[in-house]
């Protein structure tokens, strides 16, 4: 039995989904092999995915990769943005009901790690701003999750984190925070921006999760909507930031990566994309300016939801994802186009 099969069994055994409309878990990976993940000169993006299906789109592991010559880098910021413009979308997985999600569901996940440095040690929290699609009904719902990556299991309590949502059990001793945001009926083109920003004091981190709809069909928008404002209570904070770090793994062996990736509808489910055409962009705020994340891979690795039949390439300096056989590789070392 291979590693991904073991992970899948663990995830399926943990599914206890309370009946709350649109309540969806977006699982982080877990190191279930018992192997020790040790840091070398830089992280290895291929610990969890070496072949399809994988979360597909664009992601930064904090690595420049020039034909195998790898150089790590670190980005710290208080705000990150994920841009998407979709002109075609249809996904289907006939096995989806086994995971508790609709067969036509899919997600586009904007995932980033919050690093909190305290006098007691370093804590890591996985922030997810997710577009959950019912692709046969042209329905989009925004959902967020927060997971604790500091220990081998994610543990959060209602006294440790508050917001518009709530803490729930994911089974297997894990707890996480989630909130269900607004829903939209869409037509194409559909373009919007995921937005995550944060600030901190000596005893708490404040996270705003939201989006900005740019266009649905022929209607243009432009208003930012923060649908969740989260407080993570943490004593003795020295510093905190949203982090991309190619030098180190999180305390539980995942990545300090930033992901804008397609996957299944939730609960660790994969899906296959029968139709897809979209433009993607990954950005952070530096000195008050929107700045492209420079190097991008074609897949993410922190999330367990994965995709078949998504091929990502560059077109005139811009990442494009459409139907095709996945290639898990470096996409560019020089993303510089500002689409926002």
Swiss-Prot record:
Pfam families: Thermopsin. Its EC number is 3.4.23.42. Residues 29-41 form a propeptide. Residues 1-28 form the signal peptide. One of its GO terms (cellular component) is extracellular region. Optimum temperature is 90 degrees Celsius. Thermostable. Optimum pH is 2. Keywords: Aspartyl protease, Glycoprotein, Hydrolase, Protease, Secreted, Signal. The keyword Glycoprotein applies. May represent a new class of acid proteases. It digests proteins and peptides in acidic solution. This is Thermopsin. It comes from Sulfolobus acidocaldarius (strain ATCC 33909 / DSM 639 / JCM 8929 / NBRC 15157 / NCIMB 11770). The gene is thpS.
């Amino acid at each position: 039995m291979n590693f991904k099969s073991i992970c899948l069994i663990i995830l399926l055994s943990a599914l206890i989904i309370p009946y709350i409309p649109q309540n969806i878990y977006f699982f982080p990976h877990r190191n279930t092999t018992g192997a020790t993940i040790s840091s070398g000169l830089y992280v290895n993006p291929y610990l969890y995915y070496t072949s399809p299906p994988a979360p597909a789109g664009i992601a930064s592991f904090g690595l420049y990769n020039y034909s195998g010559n790898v150089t790590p880098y670190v980005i710290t910021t208080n705000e990150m943005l994920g841009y998407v413009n979709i002109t075609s979308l249809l996904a289907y997985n006939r096995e989806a009901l086994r995971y508790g999600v609709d067969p036509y569901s899919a997600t586009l996940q904007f995932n980033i790690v919050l690093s909190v440095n305290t006098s007691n040690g370093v804590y890591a929290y996985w922030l997810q701003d997710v577009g959950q699609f019912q692709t046969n009904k042209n329905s989009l719902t925004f959902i967020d999750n927060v997971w604790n990556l500091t220990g081998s299991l994610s543990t959060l309590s209602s006294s440790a984190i508050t917001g518009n949502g709530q803490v729930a059990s994911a089974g297997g001793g894990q707890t996480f925070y989630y909130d269900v945001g607004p829903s939209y009926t869409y037509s194409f083109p559909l373009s919007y921006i995921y937005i995550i920003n944060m600030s901190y004091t000596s005893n708490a981190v404040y996270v705003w999760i939201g989006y900005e709809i740019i266009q649905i069909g022929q209607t243009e928008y432009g208003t930012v909507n923060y649908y969740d404002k989260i407080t993570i209570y943490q004593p003795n904070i020295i510093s905190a930031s949203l982090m991309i770090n190619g030098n180190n793994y999180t305390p539980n062996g995942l990545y300090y990566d930033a992901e804008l990736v397609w996957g299944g509808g939730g609960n660790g489910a994969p899906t296959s994309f029968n139709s897809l055409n979209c433009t993607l962009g990954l950005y952070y705020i530096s000195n008050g300016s929107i700045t492209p994340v420079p190097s991008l891979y074609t897949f993410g690795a922190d999330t367990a939801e994965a995709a078949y039949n998504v091929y990502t390439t560059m077109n005139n300096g811009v990442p494009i994802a459409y139907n095709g056989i996945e290639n898990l590789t470096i996409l560019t070392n020089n993303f510089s186009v500002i689409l926002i």
